[in-house]
């Protein structure tokens, strides 16, 4: 006598599945750090930005990640260049 068994095993717990969400990136802390009229020292970061939302004016340096920083001690001055552009300068006196 011969017996033929056909055994099928199924999962006894539901699979977890996959999702495309569920991640978050670290904060980048972008934005204006020193505002119009504030006193700054040489090397102070004025704006951290992606691209040149603000352009470097007088006595300002620009980093490789478009960070604007002061080259001299003085006061921050936000200025308009034409209709759309904005620039930031540092002046030694108000």
UniProtKB/Swiss-Prot annotation:
InterPro entries according to UniProt: Ribosomal_bL27 (IPR001684), Ribosomal_bL27_CS (IPR018261)
Positions of the propeptide removed during maturation: 1-10
GO biological process: translation
PANTHER family: LARGE RIBOSOMAL SUBUNIT PROTEIN BL27M, RIBOSOMAL PROTEIN L27
Protein name: Large ribosomal subunit protein bL27
Superkingdom of the source species: Bacteria
Keyword Ribosomal protein: yes
GO MF annotations in UniProt: structural constituent of ribosome
Origin species: Fusobacterium nucleatum subsp. nucleatum (strain ATCC 25586 / DSM 15643 / BCRC 10681 / CIP 101130 / JCM 8532 / KCTC 2640 / LMG 13131 / VPI 4355)
Keyword line: Ribonucleoprotein, Ribosomal protein
A Gene Ontology term for the protein's cellular component: cytosolic large ribosomal subunit
UniProt-listed Pfam families: Ribosomal_L27 (PF01016)
Family: Belongs to the bacterial ribosomal protein bL27 family.
Post-translational modification: The N-terminus is cleaved by ribosomal processing cysteine protease Prp.
């Amino acid at each position: 006598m011969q017996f033929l068994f056909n055994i099928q095993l199924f999962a006894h717990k539901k699979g977890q599945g996959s999702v495309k969400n569920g991640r978050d990136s670290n904060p980048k802390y972008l934005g204006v750090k020193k505002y119009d009229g504030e006193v700054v020292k040489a090397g102070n970061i004025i704006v951290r930005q992606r691209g040149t939302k603000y352009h470097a004016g007088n006595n300002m340096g620009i980093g490789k990640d478009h960070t604007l920083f002061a080259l001299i001690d003085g006061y921050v001055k936000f200025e308009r260049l034409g209709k759309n552009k904005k620039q930031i300068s540092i002046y030694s006196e108000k």
